[in-house]
Structures are given as C-alpha cells and as structure tokens.
Amino acid sequence: MLKSFVKNAVTTVVRLPGISYVVQHPSVRQVLEPMKGGQLLYGYGWFRPHPFDRELGIEASGFMPTEQLTIDDSIATRGLGYAGSQPTPVRVALDSLPDLERFAFFDMGCGKGRALIIASEYPFKSLVGVEYAPDLAERGRLNAAICAERYPERTAIRIDLADATTYTFPEGDLVVFLYNPFQAELVEKVVRNIEAAIDSDPSRRVFVVYCNPVSVHCFDASPKLVRRFAKQVPYAASERGFGPNIDETVVIWQGGALPAPTERADDVIQFNEDGTHAFIHYRRYR
C-alpha cells in the first residue's frame, strides 16, 4: 500500500507542467531513468502509450498475453503474446540491408502492425503482415489505414489473417521479420518455410531480421542461412521506458543468391534467467 501511495504521489508531481518539462527532457531522462527508482518517474515496459504511436495516431502499445487473444489453445500455448517493436532496433536493422526496393517485407506474427509501419518508411515493393489472432489483425489493419491516410506516398500495408507456421511466401526477394513472436517449436516451422522458399527459387535473395532472438538457435541451425549482423541496439532516448529494457539484440541472417557477408556476426547470444530476453555475451543484461 505504501509503495502504491508513493508511486501515485510521484506520478502526480511529475505531471505538473514545469516539472514534467524538465523530467521528460531527453538529456535529463537519459540520466534519471536507468537509476534505481527511475521507473517511478517514467513507468515501465509496454503498457504506456508509445511516442511513435501518439505521433502517428495509432494504437499499437501494450502487452497482450496469448490467453487474452482469440486463438485456439494449440497456438496459445506456444505463442509469446503481443508487444510492439521498438522503432530504433527495426530501423538499425533495415538500414543495414541493401537494395530494399527489390524486396518484399513480411512480418511473421505482426500483431498490431507497428513494425510494418516502421518498415513503410523504406522503399519495399510490398509490405505484408501475417497474424493468427483476428483481434490483433483487425487493429493492425486500422493502424495501417491511418498510416496510409497520413503517408499516401508509402508502400501500402496488407495484413493476412493466417498461420505463420504454414505460410507460403510468394516469388521474389524477401525480408522476413520477427519480434520474438512464438516459442522455438513454431519458429522452427517458419525456418522450414523460409528454406522451402529458397529451394523453390535459387535466384531469390532472402534476409531474416529477428529482434530479441530468443530462438536464435533455430536459424543458426539452418544450412540455408548464414548470419550477417548481430548487434545490441540501444533504444533512442524517447523510447526508453516504453519497452522491456534499454536496448535490444538484433540478429540478421541471409540466404539464397546473396554474396557472402563481409563482416563476422558470430557473437554468442545469451538469455536472462527466465529466457524471455536475448543479449550478446559481452553485454551485461539490464
């Protein structure tokens, strides 16, 4: 009770106009938020409306465990719930890829579509989300419509209500994106589908972008894919306090008709105690 009282009191004080301006200034926030008690000032995790969402007028924040989604039990027990991607790790990953205007972007387990909207900042030839939960897919379509109205010059977003583990990719070059959507058993099926896409057309080029790669071993084990990128990407100052951590591991693999990577990306990926977050071995998880 005392903890709740203190939290409510602090929240009330920091919302006062003068204090709020100082506390929310990026240079001040960067210092205070990582400190002990910083969560009292800034909240924690996915549950606060994200600045990216507020700016665009979409609703993609929050965390929804699988038991709150309208999906059957066989998927619910192997899914990991919904949470929106942080913009900076997605942008850093996509900035590292060449020739994007020749690629189609697929978000496997796209949820409410935030990663798709971030990807719409880039010149992909198509943007497709694959989502199994009807309620998430519907919200994703509403968010995509808002994005299309505000940015009509961008590539249109399509969201397919489908099972990512049985999804058949169309012809052409692919960027396949995942933000830790489900457990390894289902991730392995996505890997098999990507391998089948490569086998069906050896001339196609494929990149796989995996944020918070808890099932990294599934892709590392594939004979059709090789790592090209592995980094711990800090959140932007404006994003801190709106996700589960202060940075995020991103790993990218490539396959098909692509030249061998020019840089090593064989960093060891480790995990926190409950196995929900991945981090590169040289960084202490926070």
What are these regions (language model features)?
Residues 113-117:
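Glycine-rich SAM-binding Motif I of class I
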Residues 125-128:
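Short beta-strand element of Class I
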Residues 2-101, 137-172:
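S-adenosyl-L-methionine
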